[in-house]
Amino acid sequence: MASLSFAQIKLKNPVADFARARPEFGLRRSRRVGFRVLASETQKEPDLSVTVNGLHMPNPFVIGSGPPGTNYTVMKRAFDEGWGAVIAKTVSLDAAKVINVTPRYARLRAGVNGSVKGQIIGWENIELISDRPLETMLKEFKQLKEEYPDRILIASIMEEYNKAAWEELIDRVEQTGVDAFEINFSCPHGMPERKMGAAVGQDCALLEEVCGWINAKATIPVWAKMTPNITDITEPARVALNSGCEGIAAINTIMSVMGINLDSLRPEPCVEGYSTPGGYSSKAVHPIALAKVMNIAKMMKSEFSEKDYSLSGIGGVETGHDAAEFILLGANTVQVCTGVMMHGYCLVKKLCDELKDFMRKHNFQSIEDFRGASLQYFTTHTDLVKRQQEAIKQRKAIRKGLQSDKDWTGDGFVKETESMVSN
């Protein structure tokens, strides 16, 4: 990911210093005092557009793979509402093997005993990939690209451990004109039973082999979607990038059991009296997703800073501020799936407005102005202890006053002077 987020930045003030440092990294110079715009400078409307792996999007908000991208009608709606890109629901060669059940969702609410009036903070699904015939989905991909040639349509694909099957799927999907692939290496339920989804994403040797097949065949950008159900998410992300993928998407859902009905003693969602662990999403996963994305971004900054790789953040995005957090941690784009299921496709307008408000507050003109800006403030706990001990030492010294002429420093000269004033 060749961007500011992977530059080596050492700043003291987390906001004002970042603005002053930006010109050092080839970004736009402007006349600023801190973040207050001078009277002679007219503030421009923030530009939300992004270019990722050569793909131009009007904003960084992407429909995540799932029900919001399940057919032509809903994907058309997403484009009409103004989403930056759409990732279709995952397809494979043989949809006949995909059999869904109902109910397939369960919700977790905040409040006393999960009151029905409480805010929805968690969402579990046991839904599989697309159960529609591949040929039908391919026709709809082609139709969408014909009707929206300037909009970005990304195909999410998944196959069994079979090189020929992967090659056939890639070839057939590419012929529709889609702009990129997102490889589903991360679905935590159902598909791993067929050595698909997370079964590949959790096995780095298997992942390396399959990524090799995919990238030898694909002629459009490839993103690898990571599973959070692993000890160190940077390991498969590194393997995917080293094996030819141009981008990483993280995270997919977290393996979970939503709860037990205390009247029936049966798990939720309950299908004929039984259930199975599923994928957890929505607001409650947001902090976990931020940590995973932060770790991936730091790895990419350290090991792939010269490459034009991308990072797509996923997990609990319902506001523009949620999105800003992912971008501050290095994400180029932000995906929304459960949020659309809860609030509708019109959510994108709110996301754009709130992200622009954040950018105006800090006088950021583009996404690149602040992408990755917060990465530098993550360190080890050992380093935090050292920093705090030093800060306490300095505060004590200032309160005590200077003991000798040798104690004067240039950096804290004014404070040092004030420390010896009596009134």
What residue spans do the PLM features occupy?
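Thr-Gly-centered strand-to-loop micro-motif
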Residues: 64-65, 312-314, 336-337
